[in-house]
């Protein structure tokens, strides 16, 4: 919707009564009905970040439903949701839980839904957490009328945070097939509403745009393609994120040593760290989680994720083929945990289990891996042969044989992505660029036709599908979470349950390797990573 499709109605009296000020209304009758409007607005009430990117979430503290004829409460839910305990979090009247009301002159309007929500901003050290009453009201005399009202739990404009309009109440009304927005201004602030350039007026315009867009979307059958918060509770994740962001973001952004955008990488890795910490509490138990497991971040890149996890008390290592400039900014206890090594999975170097049974003394499989060298000192390209025995002994090679309590992280780990479910440890992998087990670029197709229609058949979706397929084949019971990170490549595939874990490497893994040609190019490709420039995702 544009200014041509919305009328600025500030000169008109509000249908809601003398306390209210009309702001905007649709120029033409809307083509959706009350059910579409209410479904959309109930979602906006629960997901206020739809209206403002400054908002992180809403905690629904009170959820009441009323019978329109009798006015009696037919459903009542109250939740005590704890807030983070970090010092410096700003709060305004968050102990005020009594639902509020405002005068309404519209005839026969009664409350259908009544909520008290706590709005949590992304940065509660800058913007205050507040409580707000949300009402959905219907008319007993006009079945097509619906009114949504927002009332903050404070009476002073100076207490109003940046992320909501600075008014005493907001009303969004569907009546006579027109959609309109109305305010009750704070004392002495009514004149501001007569200037369309004022932020509070521009906000009214956007609120009406959102209400129209989402109501129309419901009517047109819009369905969310992405579901968040499937594996880890949203509140636990977001509170952990707020805590970590406050603790680490300034140091990391101020001391960024890479050429890439620090804010994108820092805040993305803070979110991934928050998710992992809450995931590990779920898997290993919330008590003493740091003593029950350790991690290996394969393809750790700039090391931000490792830095945060180690500083939070977790034991682990970050491994990458190339050291990054950022490694130099971390304290000594973190630097010691960042290793410049290439990953060559031991399944490529060790004897097959059947061979090992007949010759228990064997430590390597006797394979040789060719690699071409080009140098000005050579009269022609030369081929070097690496033996499995030499690679097993090389300090520059990590063969991914870790302690049993290891959890593997693959955060946009490119060539390693498809390998991670095959290594025999619980894991979380966030796919990015598509490579096969030889380290060559490849495009996988989504296997299921119906799934491809629903999710798309992009290179990325094909890679995600491939990782899930490989994990399933070797016995992992996987879960998938669409992470709340600033990246379109945000699918996390998680596996921590596998009845065959003590049998790795299984026959199925060798079958997969045979199907991919033995992964013969892996050694050469991974060695080349040591010479190439780091990628910035």
From Swiss-Prot:
GO terms for biological process: tRNA methylation. Keywords: Cytoplasm, Methyltransferase, S-adenosyl-L-methionine, Transferase, tRNA processing. Its EC number is 2.1.1.211. One of its GO terms (molecular function) is tRNA(Ser) (uridine(44)-2'-O-)-methyltransferase activity. It is an enzyme of class 2 (transferase). It is found in: Cytoplasm. It catalyses: uridine(44) in tRNA(Ser) + S-adenosyl-L-methionine = 2'-O-methyluridine(44) in tRNA(Ser) + S-adenosyl-L-homocysteine + H(+). One of its GO terms (cellular component) is cytoplasm. Signal peptide: none annotated. The keyword Cytoplasm applies. Probable adenosyl-L-methionine (AdoMet)-dependent tRNA (uracil-O(2)-)-methyltransferase. Belongs to the TRM44 family. This is tRNA (uracil-O(2)-)-methyltransferase. It comes from Kluyveromyces lactis (strain ATCC 8585 / CBS 2359 / DSM 70799 / NBRC 1267 / NRRL Y-1140 / WM37).
